[in-house]
Amino acid sequence: MSNGHFIAIVQATLIVLCTIGVWHYSTSNDESQHSGNLVVVDSNDIEHRFEESPSRVVITNTYAGTVMRMLDIDLDVIVGASGDFQDETIWPEFTEIPLVQLSAHSEIDFEALLDCYPDVYIVFASNGMVDTGAIRDKLEPVGIKVLALDFYKYDTLEQEIAVLAKLFGKEQEAKEIFEEFEEIENMVEERISGIDDSLKPNVVMEHHASLTRDPVVLTGTSQWTDIIERAGGINVFADLPGHTTHVDMEAIIDANPDVLMFDGI
């Protein structure tokens, strides 16, 4: 047999073996994505199955980090995070955690992310600046579950906390948090229930983008309107379209709000 024929046979064999390897990985990965008795459903209505609580997690926003703290989840499971956690005063646990993206809204450094070998990537579910579907399409085929949870919308906050609580075996901690929520809500409701609408304070909630450009306000579809109304206030710009919208400074002055607030970054 000539050297040329031998080399051709070796090359063909390697191609076949690589093809079989890729097929086996793809098949086993698909099976692992759909197996396990620990089942949670995220805020995109995607079901995720786990054999056990994940031990390698990447988180992108401080909302998720705060909820993990509230539930007393061991933060040693965090193997990667965004630049939103780089304030050592607030997040000292994250000083040595690898950076996988500059912020919760920025592009992912996929090489850095894959180097973390995460089981789960926790991301916003419905934030307009994050394409959660595209992220899922890229990460889940390589075995990384994309868990979509917002943690900043009050009407879904308890359900989302419950998802993490179930995933990490912190149901009792969640129960205590929910009881405290209910106690505070009842106290506020009792205090404001007798207040006439004409006496409720008018509130303008500005988006933090207003700090660097023309005013941007939160409207009726934003998470803030629900909180403002629960607290006994009235969002002056609730009827404007969109989640956020630009307004003139004159519009804010003309509204003559009793309270002017900025949302956090």
Each model region followed by its residue ranges:
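Solvent-exposed loop/turn segments at secondary-structure junctions
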Residues: 63-66, 84-87, 120-121, 126-130, ...
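A short, structured surface patch at a secondary-structure boundary
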Residues: 59-116, 120-129, 233
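Secretory targeting signatures
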Residues: 1-31
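Ligand-binding pocket segment of bilobal, Venus flytrap-like solute-binding proteins
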Residues: 225-227, 244-265
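Extracytoplasmic substrate-binding proteins
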Residues: 26-29, 36-37, 47, 131-213, ...
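Alpha-helical, coiled-coil/dimerization segments enriched in small aliphatic residues
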Residues: 215-243
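A local structural motif
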Residues: 47-54, 92-101, 230-241
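Short helix-initiation/N-cap motifs at beta->coil->alpha
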Residues: 43-45, 99-111, 130, 152, ...
